[in-house]
Regions:
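Positively charged n-region of N-terminal signal peptides that target proteins for export
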Residues: 1-5
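Bacterial N-terminal signal peptides
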Residues: 7-19
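Extracellular ligand-binding/catalytic regions of CAZymes and related secreted enzymes
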Residues: 24-36, 46, 54-57, 61, ...
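Hydrophobic residues at beta-strand termini and immediately following loops
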Residues: 69, 189-191, 224
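Catalytic beta-strand/loop cores that center a nucleophilic Ser/Cys/Thr
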Residues: 138-218
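Helical hinge/lid and interdomain linker segments adjacent to catalytic or ligand-binding clefts
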Residues: 29-122
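A glycine-rich, often tryptophan-bearing local segment used as a flexible ligand/cofactor-contacting loop or short
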Residues: 88, 92-164
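Generic alpha-helical structural context detector
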Residues: 9, 130-133, 243, 247
């Protein structure tokens, strides 16, 4: 419990500092707003905390203004009209009002970057099921483990500069039914390599087509199935992809 309190205290202090920075002229830059939840699984909170620090530190060089909130009621029309990109770090909206505001935002041309657990919304939100590619969560490995990942489309801006294959840090890898690849509107960017299987001990992924990152061309969105624990930023490859994804969402390009 001491670890959780420490993480929350550090996060609160950082958010206060971020709010002070955003009160300065950076507000003229396109706005990126991240949503997170304090609570739930600690590994998800640790990722959210680390990601917010990095987004905040890179905002000036990236040409955007960054803010974060744990108040999901901020996901409303009044706020979103001024936001270029919405990020879900370790949760998803729970109320009808929040979800409907997000639907209007995305169908109106907004942009979204979602990590890991945010994909669980497919099991209780029909619109989001279609948004993510017409899929539902199926299974995952446990414990969290590293895995070899292959780049599917090296020409896409989101994976620009990534090696064709690499070992990603420990993660709870999700599989989906059906595979997102079966949707003609989905472009898969990363996939688990078949050499990983069987993957897991208590819960095992035994094979199949398991995409790790993709876009749905009907929307301006990127889903990345990593965000479990604080190892994502321990190697340069995944952070580079996150930077690419945000850059692509801010500045549409092929």
């Amino acid at each position: 419990m001491r670890v959780i309190r420490s993480s929350i205290a550090g996060l609160a202090a950082w958010l206060l500092a971020t709010q002070c920075v955003l009160a300065q002229p950076a507000a003229t830059r396109p706005k990126v707003l991240a949503f997170f939840t304090v609570g739930g699984e600690l590994d998800h909170l640790l990722f959210a905390q680390q990601a917010m620090r990095v987004f905040g530190a890179r905002a000036a060089d990236g040409g955007y203004a960054f803010a974060a909130t744990s108040d999901w009621d901020v996901l409303n029309d009044s706020t979103l009209k001024d936001v270029r990109v919405v990020i879900w770090l370790n949760d998803m909206p729970r109320t009808a009002a929040q979800r409907q505001a997000f639907e209007r935002y995305m169908t109106g041309g907004g942009a979204w970057l979602g990590f890991h657990i945010s994909g669980f919304g497919t099991n209780a939100w029909p619109w989001f099921t279609e948004f993510l590619g017409g899929i539902r969560f199926s299974a995952s490995n446990w414990p969290a483990l590293p895995a070899r990942v292959n780049v599917d489309d090296r020409a896409h801006s989101v994976v620009n500069g990534l090696p064709p294959t690499f070992v990603a840090p420990i993660n709870e890898w999700y599989s989906w039914t059906p595979s997102p690849r079966t949707n003609p509107d989905v472009k898969v960017l990363l996939t688990l390599d078949s050499s990983n299987f069987p993957l897991g001990v208590k819960n095992t992924l035994n094979g199949g087509d398991i995409p790790v990152a993709w876009i749905n061309s009907k929307f301006r969105m990127v889903y990345l199935n990593y965000g479990h624990g604080d190892r994502v930023y321990s190697t340069p490859i995944l952070p580079a992809m996150i930077d690419n994804a945000l850059r692509w969402l801010l500045n549409p390009s092929p």
